[in-house]
């Protein structure tokens, strides 16, 4: 912390010394512009720039993201108030937390759009970002215009449009820990009607951590991809914009170390006997059609999305051979949206449209139980005593005819006496989901200063689950060369479905001032659809096999006495499936958001300030927790009632004739349970979590960035930019009981960029004070003993980027 404070003080003193040297300038032409004015993005549903709307938002330009060394959405979240996407150890995990809501599995809390394509599979959220022109982050429910799973807000990524941006970009990067990056993109406007862009990238790192048991790297990664975009404008009023993006990633994953929950320090390096791995291939393709008519604009967005991945996870996170999950997803999704909005000058502006989507998702997730699990089962089922009893019985019989030592030798020579247990849980799930939404929003200028906003969306989601899984328990008897197996197969094969419908209203008032500032108030409803849990079937099967212990023992006795294989099949009746339906289903999450804010232009546009306060009432909050009894998987549960309130502030400024630019962001979130009771295990007493803080939600988020550009008179260099940035967050509780947490931490970065005209060289450093912190922590009881694990934040890293444009 001392190093961090000294570094910040040095940076501040340096900035003021530079400003003092430039006081000789008689006229300061500094001005902060709305970023909507600098980087234009399509407004398919809105009429005004974001700072003129009644919404809390943050915009990052491509230039800012380059100086901040942004590589994915996790990096973007560091510079947006109250918006957190932590590093959980793999591209697979895309948890987003905002304004007190979020979860690690199932329905996301925010919607993600790339060039107006809504990403349907949560596993596609965490991907490499490149060719970006700008990113918009809208906080607060956006369901009226964007539908389900935008309860916390929306992220819109826009890539460079070849109609507006031309040339060839080559970006090369290299850093410590063998960070390497290469991107090549070409943008060509053939004529006034045709334009295209094509590009490819590679990104990789050797990572920071190693598996102390196997010696393998635990967080190294290689990923590559390409993107093609075609734009056709046959007339001034009609355009077609088609984009296809492909990405592949291959990485070692989940470098979780053993955590001391009291100190928050990681005591031991990762030591899993099965190193986690993640591989993913995905394609996102979309066609946008826009028509500018007389009195209205028409927009059509069609997309197809494909994702195929495989996740291997040591589910006990330890050196023992206990349980491994090998999960694969195959997802195909289509979306279609038609939007109409008026384009007339007048007091009334409206947007209306319809959205539909369908996603096919097939998941295979076999649980493989290892030798240490088998040894535990053998002991719990008293098979070790049975093995000893069989051996002693045979030994006593043979000892009556020969010396005991000779009898022992004869038994071993014949193959000995062995009783083993093996358990398999194959899982196959089909979970298709359909969604349709019809929406309308109107903005009416009551006066020249006061605008009223009202909107409504009807949203319907139909979720289905078809599962085919079983508990396959095998007892293997090997008695002096004679082998027999007792197999009990408990089958679960059923189909369930559920429908969820919702009306999502929005009300707002905006009052404008002469200098472009405004104040606003909104009331909006948020919504996350319900669905079905699939990761908890390992626990369900384990409980089922225990309930069928009499069947298992009867089969074992028959196999032992007949020396033949015996198989018993256990099926479930409708009453069992009805009980299971209630166990795997989770309800929709609903919320009401009340917000008051302002977008202020201060000191003749030297500073832009965006400030808002909000209060959210949440019902049936969706929480991701480990399954109670064994902890082999995670499931979504509903807390009865919760609430969150907070403040979000963003400041942007410019000085010294725009040579100095800076920004500060701060978010405060207080999120707590109002009514929530749960059990630590199936037979444990109920625990009341009322009044406890919602886990994984940082109470504070803080970010800052400052750049100063020196104009040079050198023939080979146009300018030199020196900058620093900081982001921090905390306190973060890691469990519902609020027993252990991550304290507030801050990470400092810096960069120096030399602009040579044709190319730019940027030297950068991340976490230059080498702060120690955890981005994720949890406890697991998979082995029967509770252990605490954590994902550490990345330590110091430095490198350079070379950008060439011609």
Each language-model region and where it sits:
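Short acidic/polar hinge/loop motifs at secondary-structure boundaries
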Residues: 115-141
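Membrane-embedded beta-barrel scaffold of Gram-negative outer-membrane proteins
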Residues: 288-313, 518-520, 542-635, 643-645, ...
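Solvent-exposed loop segments that connect transmembrane elements
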Residues: 210-216, 254-271, 316-323, 368-426, ...
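N-terminal periplasmic accessory domains that precede
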Residues: 95-100, 113, 134-137, 149-171, ...
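Gram-negative outer-membrane beta-barrel transporters
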Residues: 341, 345, 351, 355-357, ...
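Extracytoplasmic beta-strand/coil segments of soluble accessory domains associated
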Residues: 57, 74-117
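C-terminal beta-signal and adjacent terminal beta-strands/loops
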Residues: 361, 374, 527, 658, ...
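Transmembrane beta-barrel wall of Gram-negative outer-membrane proteins
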Residues: 167-169, 174-205, 213-251, 280-285, ...
């Amino acid at each position: 912390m001392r190093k961090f404070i000294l570094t910040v003080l040095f940076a501040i003193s340096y900035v003021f010394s530079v400003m003092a040297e430039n006081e000789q300038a008689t006229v300061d032409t500094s001005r902060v512009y709305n970023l909507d004015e600098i980087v234009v993005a399509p407004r398919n549903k809105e009429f005004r720039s974001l700072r003129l709307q009644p919404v809390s938002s943050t915009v990052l330009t491509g230039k800012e993201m380059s100086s901040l060394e942004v590589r994915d959405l996790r990096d973007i979240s560091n510079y947006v108030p109250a918006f957190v996407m932590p590093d959980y150890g793999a591209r697979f995990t895309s948890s987003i937390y905002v304004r007190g809501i979020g979860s690690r599995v199932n329905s996301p809390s925010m919607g993600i759009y790339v060039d107006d394509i809504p990403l349907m599979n949560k596993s596609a959220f965490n991907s490499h970002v490149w060719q970006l022109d700008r990113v918009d982050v809208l906080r607060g429910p956006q369901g009226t215009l964007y539908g389900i799973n935008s309860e916390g807000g929306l992220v819109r990524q826009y890539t460079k449009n070849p109609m507006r941006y031309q040339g060839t970009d080559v970006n090369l990067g290299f850093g410590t820990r063998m960070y390497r990056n290469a991107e090549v993109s070409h943008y060509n406007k053939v004529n006034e009607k045709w334009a295209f862009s094509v590009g490819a990238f590679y990104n990789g790192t050797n990572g920071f951590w190693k598996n102390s048991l196997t010696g393998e790297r635990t967080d190294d990664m290689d990923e590559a991809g390409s993107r093609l975009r075609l734009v056709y404008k046959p007339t001034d009023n009609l355009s077609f914009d088609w984009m296809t993006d492909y990405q592949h990633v291959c990485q070692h994953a989940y470098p979780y170390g053993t955590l001391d929950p009291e100190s928050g320090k990681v005591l031991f390096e990762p030591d899993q006997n099965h190193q986690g791995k993640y591989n993913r291939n995905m394609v996102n393709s979309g066609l946008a059609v826009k028509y500018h008519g007389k009195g209205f604009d028409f927009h059509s967005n069609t997309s197809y999305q494909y994702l195929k991945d495989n996740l291997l996870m040591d589910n006990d996170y330890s050196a023992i051979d206990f349980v491994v999950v090998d999960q694969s997803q195959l997802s195909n999704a289509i979306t279609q949206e038609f939007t109409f909005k008026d384009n007339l000058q007048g007091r009334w502006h409206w947007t209306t449209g319809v959205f539909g989507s369908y996603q096919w998702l097939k998941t295979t997730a076999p649980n493989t139980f290892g030798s240490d699990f088998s040894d535990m089962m053998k002991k719990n089922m008293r098979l070790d005593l049975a093995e000893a009893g069989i051996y002693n019985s045979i030994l006593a019989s043979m000892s009556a005819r020969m010396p005991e030592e000779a009898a022992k030798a004869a038994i071993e020579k014949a193959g000995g006496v062995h009783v083993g247990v093996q358990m398999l849980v194959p899982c196959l799930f089909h979970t298709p989901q359909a969604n349709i939404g019809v929406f309308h929003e109107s903005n009416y200028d009551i006066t020249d200063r006061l605008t009223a906003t009202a909107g409504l969306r009807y949203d319907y989601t139909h979720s289905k689950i078809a599962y085919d899984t079983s508990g396959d328990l095998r007892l293997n008897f090997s008695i002096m060369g004679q082998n027999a197996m007792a197999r009990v197969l408990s089958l679960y094969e059923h189909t369930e479905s559920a429908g969820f419908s919702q009306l999502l209203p929005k009300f707002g008032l905006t009052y404008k001032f002469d200098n472009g500032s405004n104040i606003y108030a909104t009331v909006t409803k948020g919504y996350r659809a319900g669905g079905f849990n699939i990761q908890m079937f390992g626990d369900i099967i384990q409980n089922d096999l225990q309930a069928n212990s009499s069947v298992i023992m009867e089969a074992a006795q028959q196999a032992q006495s007949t020396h033949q294989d015996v198989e018993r099949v256990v099926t479930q009746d409708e009453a069992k499936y009805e009980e299971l339906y209630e166990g795997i289903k989770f309800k929709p999450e609903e919320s009401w958001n009340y917000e008051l804010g302002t977008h202020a232009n201060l000191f003749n546009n030297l500073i832009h300030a965006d400030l808002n306060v909000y209060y959210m009432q949440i019902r049936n909050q969706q929480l991701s927790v480990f399954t109670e009894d064994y902890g082999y998987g995670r499931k979504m549960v509903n807390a009865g009632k919760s609430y969150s309130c907070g403040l979000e502030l963003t400041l942007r400024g410019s000085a010294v004739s725009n040579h100095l630019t800076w920004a500060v962001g701060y978010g405060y979130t207080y999120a707590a349970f109002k009514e929530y009771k749960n059990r630590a295990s199936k037979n444990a007493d109920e625990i009341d979590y009322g009044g406890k803080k919602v886990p994984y939600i940082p109470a504070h988020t803080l970010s800052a960035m400052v750049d100063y550009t020196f104009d040079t008179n050198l023939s080979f260099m146009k300018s030199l930019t020196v900058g620093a940035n900081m982001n921090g967050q905390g306190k973060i509780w890691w469990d519902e009981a609020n027993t252990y947490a991550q304290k507030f931490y801050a990470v400092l970065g810096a960069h120096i960029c030399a602009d040579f005209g044709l190319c730019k060289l940027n030297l950068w450093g991340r976490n230059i004070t080498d702060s120690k912190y955890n981005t994720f922590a949890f406890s697991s009881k998979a082995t029967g003993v509770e252990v605490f694990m954590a994902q550490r934040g990345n330590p110091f890293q430095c490198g350079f980027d070379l950008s060439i444009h011609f």
